[in-house]
């Protein structure tokens, strides 16, 4: 585990974006942990998040020409990632986002920011079913651009309806790589280093039942 990945977990725990307990998911599964990027609610937390997303993107070695944030949670994430790329990696990238409702006045349309062109890195919090990100892929395709990668905070490494995770299904279907700052293996590693045997046992059992590699 890289230092920034451990820092991300610690920030998520401090902000209560990552919690341990019993949480009923939309799928009906009772999960021993829950992740909600909406809990990162301060300027400092967002600045740190931007650095983590930027580092994950740079480490992956993906070539890209711009940043895109899907509405709504992806918008601040894309903004802070673009800022971090400029400040820490000397990559001054254009960025854009979409709104969920079409605006009839002013500039109109659903897209805001830089024109969608070239290779587009999409920044989002998580991929659950992949519906929202598929809509964004359609927008990028319609603009004549190409998706370079999708970057998320956490990959739950968890089966969907079949044997594959939502992320694996999306990668197979679209050919677009999905990069994550951390995955469930990193969470397990962190719990082990902290000596948190109770949560480690619960998350390990959940992973054995629903996990994918």
From Swiss-Prot:
Family from the record: Belongs to the purine/pyrimidine phosphoribosyltransferase family. PyrE subfamily.
Residues that coordinate or bind 5-phospho-alpha-D-ribose 1-diphosphate: 26, 72-73, 99-100, 103, 105, 124-132
EC number annotated for this UniProt entry: 2.4.2.10
GO BP, one annotated term: pyrimidine ribonucleoside biosynthetic process
Keyword Ribonucleoprotein among UniProt keywords: no
GO cellular component, as recorded: cytoplasm
Summary of the function given for this chain in its UniProt record: Catalyzes the transfer of a ribosyl phosphate group from 5-phosphoribose 1-diphosphate to orotate, leading to the formation of orotidine monophosphate (OMP).
Single GO MF annotation: magnesium ion binding
Cofactor(s) needed: Mg(2+)
Record's subunit section: Homodimer.
Annotated Gene3D superfamilies: 3.40.50.2020
Pfam families: Pribosyltran
Pathway: Pyrimidine metabolism; UMP biosynthesis via de novo pathway; UMP from orotate: step 1/2
Record keywords, A-Z: Glycosyltransferase, Magnesium, Pyrimidine biosynthesis, Transferase
Keyword Glycoprotein recorded: no
Binding site for orotate: 34-35, 128, 156
Catalytic activity: orotidine 5'-phosphate + diphosphate = orotate + 5-phospho-alpha-D-ribose 1-diphosphate
Protein name per the record: Orotate phosphoribosyltransferase
């Amino acid at each position: 585990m890289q230092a920034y990945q451990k820092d991300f977990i610690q920030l998520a725990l401090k902000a209560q974006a990552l919690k341990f307990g019993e949480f009923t998911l939309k799928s009906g599964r009772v999960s021993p942990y829950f992740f909600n990027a909406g809990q990162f609610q301060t300027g400092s937390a967002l600045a740190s998040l931007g650095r983590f997303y930027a580092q994950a993107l740079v480490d992956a070695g993906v070539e890209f020409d711009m940043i895109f944030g899907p509405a709504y949670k992806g918008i601040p994430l894309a903004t802070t990632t673009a800022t971090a790329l400029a400040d820490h990696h000397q990559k001054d990238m254009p960025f854009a986002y979409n709104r969920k409702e079409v605006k009839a006045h002013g500039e109109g349309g659903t897209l805001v920011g830089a024109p969608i062109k070239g290779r587009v890195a999409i920044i989002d919090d998580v991929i659950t079913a992949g519906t929202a990100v598929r809509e964004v892929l359609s927008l990028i395709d319609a603009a004549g651009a190409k998706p370079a990668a999708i970057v998320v905070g956490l990959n739950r490494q968890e089966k969907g309806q079949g044997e594959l995770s939502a992320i694996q299904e999306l990668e197979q279907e679209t050919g677009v790589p999905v990069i994550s700052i951390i995955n469930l293996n990193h969470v397990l590693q962190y719990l082990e280093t902290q000596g948190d045997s109770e949560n480690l046992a619960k998350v390990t059992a959940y992973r054995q039942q629903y996990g994918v590699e």
